[in-house]
A protein has these predicted regions:
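Mg2+-dependent endonuclease catalytic cores in nucleic-acid-processing enzymes, primarily RNase H-like
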Residues: 9-120, 139, 149-151
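Acidic, Mg2+-coordinating catalytic module of metal-dependent nucleases/exonucleases
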Residues: 117-140
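Short, small-residue-biased leader/transition segments that mark boundaries at the very start
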Residues: 3-8
């Protein structure tokens, strides 16, 4: 069996329309991505599956887009597991990611109703981490090759 190696995030792109007081268009985000990736060879871009127009913009520009697995609770659990196993680490350069890890909290009102979900505030970097970990590093179901026949 192949051991998965550690993933190191050594840089980040971060923009908050709320903090900056101005939203960007999908084209502006795509321009930023191209500039940020300058000279970097990538296989694909992982995107929130709800961002249909951004996916269309990236596809139009020739990027291969992977729609992120977006189950929040399971994604958070997997991120916690990978962090504890040191399968993902973050450089000090990733200040916004580190800041968001420190401020990521569970929604108390949702918990009163039996829901596990985080407060949806200052979570752009956390969403990006969760999308990567859950979509790319998530456990794949293994086939039992010893069993013959159907389901």
């Amino acid at each position: 069996r192949r051991q998965r190696q550690m993933c190191i995030r050594d840089r980040e792109y971060y923009y908050s329309g709320r903090e900056e007081g101005q939203q960007k268009t999908d084209a502006e985000y795509a321009d930023d991505l191209e500039s940020w990736l300058s000279g970097t060879d990538i296989n694909a871009v992982i995107v929130d599956p709800a961002a249909a127009s951004f996916i269309a913009e990236l596809t139009k520009r020739g990027y291969r887009v992977i729609k992120a697995k977006n189950d929040v609770a399971d994604g958070i659990r997997l991120v916690a597991t990978k962090l504890n196993l040191l399968k993902i680490v973050f450089s000090n350069i990733c200040q916004d990611t580190i800041k968001e890890f420190a401020s990521y909290i569970w929604d108390a009102k949702a918990a009163e109703h039996g829901e596990d979900k985080p407060v949806k505030q200052y979570d752009h970097a956390m969403d990006a981490v969760r999308y990567f970990v859950y979509t790319i590093l998530g456990e794949r179901p293994r086939l039992n090759r010893k069993v013959k026949g159907g389901i």
